[in-house]
């Protein structure tokens, strides 16, 4: 079932990207904004990359002194649906629920987390949240919706990176993975003046090759142990309803702990997220609070 869900979500990803939209984790969508509203492309980034504007869906690879790809293990690349072909020793979370000792997968308090913004739908969620929470944002959405990104910050929420354009990382080359991460970091730096500390892989697709690259950026991998599958509300999947999601939330409340995966890239998922927030209440934590660590690697004035 996990493999089928991943295949389905990637197929929807391809459709929405062709329509000029940016797909959210596991299927929900976040529309890209108008170019004239973008975060200005900073001079320091032009000097470093010799480019003058933000990239499209496929960002170019820019070598970095502190990223040594010779230290990355040589593991097979794989695509959605190919889990039976890869070794369990690759420690794939999306295939085998395999986690590394450094991965964050849960929290001692039941807490919501949100992927794929910033997006217009995010604004409604920000107005209703009663506590600090964690947003994992796409770089391409960050530069296209800088005002919404700033609203997230103004309300004191924690922001982590979710790559530049939501690619299935295990299918990419090492250089392409670096590009997805570095451009997302630069987008956050230019828009929010900080260097993120937390990283969530799109689709939860991560193995030890991807981890090795992520760790060289100094990022902490954040996964989840409670999945709402709210993206199925966007795809009109008959196997998931709002009522079923809220029933799961009530069950999870009894456990009083865990990290919930949700999405803020679409109006429908935000509507459910607000109801979930009302059910759980404000006694929730950010990822940094869950593990007793700092919000960002660095902040800039």
UniProtKB/Swiss-Prot annotation:
Q: Where does acetate bind?
A: 115, 203
Catalytic reactions of this protein: [(1->4)-N-acetyl-beta-D-glucosaminyl](n) + n H2O = chitosan + n acetate
Query: Any keyword Aminoacyl-tRNA synthetase?
Result: no
Q: Which cofactor does it need?
A: Co(2+)
What residues sit in the active site? 115 (proton acceptor), 263 (proton donor)
What is the gene name? CDA1
What keywords were assigned to this record? Answer: Carbohydrate metabolism, Cell wall biogenesis/degradation, Chitin degradation, Chitin-binding, Cobalt, Disulfide bond, Glycoprotein, Hydrolase, Metal-binding, Polysaccharide degradation, Signal, Sporulation
> Per its UniProt record, what InterPro entries does this chain match?
Glyco_hydro/deAcase_b/a-brl (IPR011330), NODB_dom (IPR002509), Polysacc_deacetylase_ArnD (IPR050248)
The keyword Cell wall biogenesis/degradation is assigned to this record: yes
Briefly, what is this protein's role? Hydrolyzes the N-acetamido groups of N-acetyl-D-glucosamine residues in chitin to form chitosan and acetate. Chitosan is a component of the spore wall.
Q: What protein name does the entry list? A: Chitin deacetylase 1
Glycosylated sites = 26, 50, 68, 189
